Amino acid sequence: MCPLRSLLLISTLVLLHHLPHLSLGRSLPTTTAGPGTSCLDYSQNLLRAVSNTLQKARQTLEFYSCTSEEIDHEDITKDKTSTVEACLPLELATNESCLASRETSLITNGHCLSSGKTSFMTTLCLRSIYKDLKMYHMEFQAMNAKLLMDPKRQVFLDQNMLAAIAELMQALNFDSETVPQKPSLEELDFYKTKVKLCILLHAFRIRAVTIDRMMSYLSSS
């Protein structure tokens, strides 16, 4: 992987990390990932699913300040994970040649990469991504439980998105990992819950883009 490509990757990750109000684009069809699917395919499926879910939420909750310009942006992984730093291309961190790789390698149980052997830095990156996914999965499940109690039955989380998160988590296979967070259990205010849904979906879509960029980088390196 040449330095120019790595610099482009990390610039994209930092931009996504600090500019949460990027344009959303059109809804994309959701595909079902099958056996033997790589983590790049899973991450692309996840990005499609969260983009579709966010678009539907914006349409349904048009009177709830659900656009990226109107919401108060929040990152539930802040100070709990460090995906951008953990996924920094090794050559940028060590200033070695464009083919640099750390000698230490680990055997992973997941099937994200073609080989079961991955570098120490790659393992840290994938573990951080797993923690991100687990945090959002827990938060979305708790939020969906609240939405199901709403008498208006106005909006629910798309099960395709929850399934896409679970599929990528299963592929990463860091089941022993714990996350330093419990789902927020605020008062049962359906208006606030719907606004929070918009906030989380916007934040998670940005994180899904970051994950997809990293999986693309890892798959081609």
From Swiss-Prot:
Q: Which domain of life is it from?
A: Eukaryota
| InterPro entries for this protein | 4_helix_cytokine-like_core, IL-12, IL-12_alpha
A Pfam family cross-referenced in the UniProt record is: IL12
Keywords linked to the UniProt accession: Cytokine, Disulfide bond, Glycoprotein, Growth factor, Secreted, Signal
Please list the GO biological process terms of this entry.
cell migration; cellular response to virus; defense response to Gram-positive bacterium; extrinsic apoptotic signaling pathway; immune response; interleukin-12-mediated signaling pathway; negative regulation of blood vessel endothelial cell proliferation involved in sprouting angiogenesis; negative regulation of interleukin-17 production
Q: Which residues are the signal sequence here? A: 1-25
Q: Which PANTHER family match?
A: INTERLEUKIN-12 SUBUNIT ALPHA, INTERLEUKIN-12 SUBUNIT BETA-RELATED
Q: Which family does it belong to?
A: Belongs to the IL-6 superfamily.
Quote the function comment for this protein: Heterodimerizes with IL12B to form the IL-12 cytokine or with EBI3/IL27B to form the IL-35 cytokine. IL-12 is primarily produced by professional antigen-presenting cells (APCs) such as B-cells and dendritic cells (DCs) as well as macrophages and granulocytes and regulates T-cell and natural killer-cell responses, induces the production of interferon-gamma (IFN-gamma), favors the differentiation of T-helper 1 (Th1) cells and is an important link between innate resistance and adaptive immunity.
The name under which this protein is listed is Interleukin-12 subunit alpha
